[in-house]
Regions:
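PRPP-associated nucleotide enzymes
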Residues: 1-394
Length: 394
């Protein structure tokens, strides 16, 4: 993949760029805006004074928008400036439970449903006046409800169709739980992006004595659903791959699902090897810790868990104990969703910043450029591996 400085974006932009980070996504939005302002100022675009490039180089691409609430808890979307003719990018973090609002005098934490409703409110406030509407939703809303088992709703498919009906042209997400959910909107733009490169770079920056070959390292999938991620990581790093599958008790239902009896391992020996467990999300963390415990029992050397989304729904205590007990040596997640100050303070936590990558995607899409080279990180991964092996700064 080419970096921003190497990309030649001469196409006329679809429209003047506008970014709307919704409530709870402001920090990521500000970082993305900072990169875009810097790049466009440095590029000294030869056509920037052309009328077709009007508004190309600005001090700020953020659009003022808000979602105030009435005392009853109802809300409305408001735009503080005109968006007519703009190429609009809406950024939403549906997992940010730290945002609150007042409901009849009580403090309510925002759920994914609330965030999705806010997204629709701002799209409605645009009122069809924008040139194009793009939604950047790192954690795809309802992505875990992607298929029907018995009498269930297909929430993710319904949400995608609703956005398309409202005029959304492109939906950009990261590590969708099942990318096939795009079948719900086959004629619209849908991209699911993997942060594998950012994980590798984050790990190499933090751990200086890794031996990256099949004799000393393995990539592990904690379940059968995530094997594609582990296979890709193993291929680009030249490692062996292993996986666990969940043995469930189908005679019982606990908390809406069949309880896991055991995690069974399939793969070659992990003895003496560093292990990377890769998954799309860490929810409660029970599965990751059980898998790591089993790998330690099999005499794995160091264990690093990488997941695009760190939800940590039951807190960090079990991870603290796993770290202190030598079961887990590091946890990598991205800043695509809300991160608590407690998480960021942990000695074993490695934060992978995705803001530069998102800025590159927005910059390319605004020029109607191809995303193919951006979405394939093979070349960048090999470059960073070579730097690591040569002892250069990453």
């Amino acid at each position: 993949m080419l970096s921003r400085s190497e990309r030649i974006l001469e196409n006329i932009p679809v429209g003047s760029l506008g970014i709307i980070p919704l409530l709870g996504c402001e920090e990521l939005g500000n970082k993305v805006n900072g990169y875009l302002v810097k790049w466009r100022r440095e590029s000294a675009h030869e056509h920037k004074n052309d009328v077709a490039f009007s508004g190309y180089e600005k001090e700020n691409y953020l659009i003022n928008a808000s979602v105030p609430r009435f005392g009853s808890g109802e809300a409305k979307g408001i735009l503080g400036e005109s968006v007519r003719g703009k190429d609009i990018y809406l950024m939403v973090d549906v997992c940010n439970y730290n945002v609150t609002y007042s409901l009849t005098g009580n403090t309510n934490h925002m759920s994914p449903d609330d965030h999705f409703q806010n997204l629709k409110r701002i799209i409605a406030a645009v009122g069809g006046k924008g040139r194009r509407i793009n939604v950047i939703m790192p954690f795809l809303y309802e992505s875990r409800q992607h298929k029907r088992t018995s009498r269930e709703s297909l929430d993710c498919a319904l949400a995608l169709q609703e956005l398309v009906r409202m005029g959304v042209d492109n939906i950009i997400t990261f590590d969708a739980h099942d990318p096939r959910v795009s079948n719900a909107i086959p004629l619209s733009g849908f991209e699911t992006i993997s942060p594998t490169y950012q994980f590798i770079k984050g790990l190499l920056r933090k751990v200086k004595d890794l031996q990256i070959d099949s004799e000393h390292m393995m990539a592990i999938s904690p379940d059968e659903g995530g094997t594609n991620r582990a296979v890709y990581l193993a291929n680009v790093l030249g490692l062996d791959m292993g996986m666990f599958y969940k043995r469930r008790d189908y005679t019982q239902i606990v908390n809406g699902r069949n309880p896991i009896v055991a995690h069974e391992f399939l793969g070659s020996s992990v003895e003496g090897k560093d292990v990377i467990i890769i998954d799309d999300m860490i929810s409660s963390g029970d599965s990751i810790i059980e898998v790591a415990t089993e790998l330690k029992r099999r005499k794995a050397k160091r264990i690093f868990a990488a997941a695009t989304f760190g939800l940590f729904t039951n807190g960090m205590e079990k991870f603290d104990k796993a770290y202190e007990g030598g079961i887990i040596d590091g946890i990598l997640t991205t800043n695509l969703i809300y991160q608590t100050p407690n998480l960021l303070s942990k000695p074993y936590y490695i934060n992978c910043d995705m803001s530069k990558y998102i800025a590159l995607i927005i910059d390319t899409l605004n020029h109607d450029g191809s995303l193919s080279e951006i979405l394939s990180p093979n070349e960048r991964i090999q470059n960073v591996l070579q730097k690591y092996k040569n002892g250069e700064t990453i």
